[in-house]
A protein has these predicted regions:
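Rossmann-like NAD(P)-binding element
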Residues: 40, 55-116
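NAD(P)-dependent Rossmann-like dehydrogenase/reductase catalytic/cofactor-binding core
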Residues: 2-4, 13, 27-29, 166-169, ...
Length: 295
């Protein structure tokens, strides 16, 4: 791709998508934030406004900086707004069919020279790139942010089978502009971080379901004994138990083995609609304030 990335189209205004939109707007990019339902897109922009307001109240941003950042973000329910994008970032539900369906539509809308970046946390990039025309695949890349996006300084960059050097360098440059540290992963399920993290979470859940320790003691063991900032069960609640389950299923399907298999307790919690902080109940119970910040 030639030229700088100035216009960014973000598909998905949830926990990850609105954070991705915010950080790009903060460095001067023009951002279109898409959801099929305009109210959901506007809700994503409202969450960004609330985030910026907190930063102003804490002295991290001036009022002018916050207002200017928010003004660069336009919510939309029109996928056709991707027609002038330099970069399209997908941050929708972690399911192959959902993601490929969206990419297939965007492939017919976005400019031929636009970069396509997926925020998938586990699905192999080459499987997603199959949804677009072969000519587009050199500009298809994995760009995995971490939550909360404005705070977490890491981006996992994943090169697909056909991803070009020029695309990798363009995203590296953008990540640097965003103030993020880049790690580069091979195109295997789970990449680096979740390949390490999910077996740890799964084994912690198995220890819980087998009565080896309470949730509090398992988490304290990790925080105090392993010097982790959060215990594994509270971290799973923070990520979202449905998200954890989806990633484990991708890993189990793509790699296999007991270490990647979702524990029964996780399956049961998700089936009951107890998804962690965002629903108020997971391995722990959360107040309404935690629920409000989870989506």
């Amino acid at each position: 791709m030639e030229g700088a990335i100035e216009r960014v189209f973000v598909a998905g205004a949830g926990l990850m998508g609105h954070g991705i939109a915010q950080v790009h707007a903060a460095i001067g990019r023009t951002v279109t934030l898409f959801e099929p339902d305009l109210e959901r897109a506007e809700a994503g922009r409202d969450r960004i406004a609330a985030n910026l307001e907190r930063s102003v109240s804490k002295g991290r941003l001036t009022r002018e900086e916050a207002d200017t950042t928010l003004a660069r973000i336009e919510p939309t329910a029109d996928l056709g707004r991707a027609a002038d994008a330099d970069l399209a970032i997908e941050a929708v539900f972690e399911e192959l069919a959902v993601k490929t369906g969206l990419w297939r539509q965007l492939d017919g809308i976005a400019p031929a020279e636009a970069i396509f970046a997926t925020n998938t946390s586990s699905i192999a990039i080459h499987r997603l790139a199959e949804a677009v025309d072969e000519a587009r695949r050199p500009r298809f890349v994995g760009m995995h942010f971490f939550s909360p996006v404005p705070v977490m300084p890491l981006i996992e960059l994943i090169r697909g089978r056909d991803t070009s050097d020029a695309t990798i360098e363009a995203i590296r440059t953008l990540a640097s502009d965003l103030g993020k540290h880049v790690i580069v992963s091979g195109d295997k399920p789970g990449f680096i971080v979740n390949r390490i993290l999910m077996p740890f979470l799964a084994e912690s859940m198995r220890a819980y379901e087998q009565g080896i320790g309470t949730a509090e003691d398992i988490d304290a063991g990790a925080r105090i004994g392993l010097n982790h900032p959060m215990g594994p069960l509270e971290l799973a609640d923070f990520i979202g138990l449905d998200v954890c389950l989806g990633i484990m299923r991708v890993l189990d399907d793509g790699i296999g083995g007991e270490r990647f298999r979702a524990p029964r307790v996780l399956e049961e919690l998700v089936a009951a609609g107890n998804l962690g902080q965002k629903t108020g109940q997971g391995f722990y119970t959360y107040p309404r304030t935690a629920q409000a910040s989870g989506g």
